[in-house]
Amino acid sequence: MKSAQAAPSSSSLALEFVRVTELAAIAAAKWIGKGEAKLADKAAVDAMRKQFNTIDFRGEIVIGEGAKDESHELYIGEKLGTGKGGLVRDIAVDPLECTDSVANGRPNALTVIATGPEGSLYHAADSYMEKIAVGRAASEVIDIDAPVADNIRKVAKALGKDVSEITVAILDRERHEKLIADVRAAGARVQLFSDGDVATAIATCFRDDPIDILMGIGGSSEAVLAAAALRCLRGEILCRWKPKDDKHKKRLHDAGITDFSTILRAQDLARGDDVSFTATGVVTGPLVEGVTVIHEAVTTHSVVMSTAPRAIRFIKTRHIN
């Protein structure tokens, strides 16, 4: 009598997804420092899509390069994979997070994939969200409605630190002037970063990283990608819609989102017990090192996380031409 076969999971395709982000990173890295953000992004998109379509699975983009009429590749609703095999996945991608960092040779650029079972990843309309993210030790103490100082004090207590030792990472934007002032008034440190709140949110989960909290307003797509990783690491992210203008409000209304006060947690953005997150560095940042080329060998550094099994792997790959 044959034993029942286990249902396929993301872990069975982990290395396949790593290969996707690796090739996208290598393609984008050729444009580092050349001032061509759009060409760097296109190189990553082309490489990512091409490799996805060699994998035996059935995937659908739920977060990608925009609507079908805005993008010809990796658009929302696009089907990926060969269609063979029993694995059906929601896919969220950022083929090149921090395109400007690549164009200008600044740190912290990644190629990113998050996956989950069909219907598991939040279909986030392209807008902005207010966010607060922390690692596992402080996952139950944050409150997006609480004053900044209260959240800092609670996180400090959860981490066994003095408030003066807490570092809050904030995207370096004019809209965050008051937030920066509030963090400093509370007695904590501020670490500003130019781009890349996915990697920065994840950094809160590693005790050897100086970042303790991510706060501020950033992209909704990045919130879903970060949530997938934080689910794997038992961290937490709290988000609330913060559309910047009437155009963004209309976009959300068209997507069926009318209550901007709803608080969304990691579990709301990346549901289920089979979530995965894969990223490869293009330019070195807080999560992984970037692409390096020595003679004829290209080296990539990637991170792979999953909730089933709950694990994190750092992968260094040397690609021999």
Stretches with model-predicted labels:
Residues 112-192, 285-286, 290-292, 298-320:
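Acidic beta-strand-loop-alpha-helix segment within the catalytic core
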Residues 85-97, 101-120:
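DPxDG-like acidic metal-binding loop motif
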Residues 73-75, 103-106, 124-127, 178-184, ...:
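Short acidic, glycine/serine/threonine-rich loops at helix termini
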Residues 2-7, 13, 203-221, 225-321:
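Oxyanion/phosphate-interacting regions
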Residues 68-70, 175, 194-201:
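Short acidic loop-to-helix transition motifs that present clustered carboxylates
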Residues 183-190, 197-203, 207-211:
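Glycine-rich ThDP/TPP pyrophosphate-binding loop and its adjacent helix/strand module
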Residues 1-92, 153, 157, 273, ...:
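N-terminal subdomain of lithium-sensitive/metallo-dependent phosphomonoesterases centered on the IMPase/IPPase/PAP
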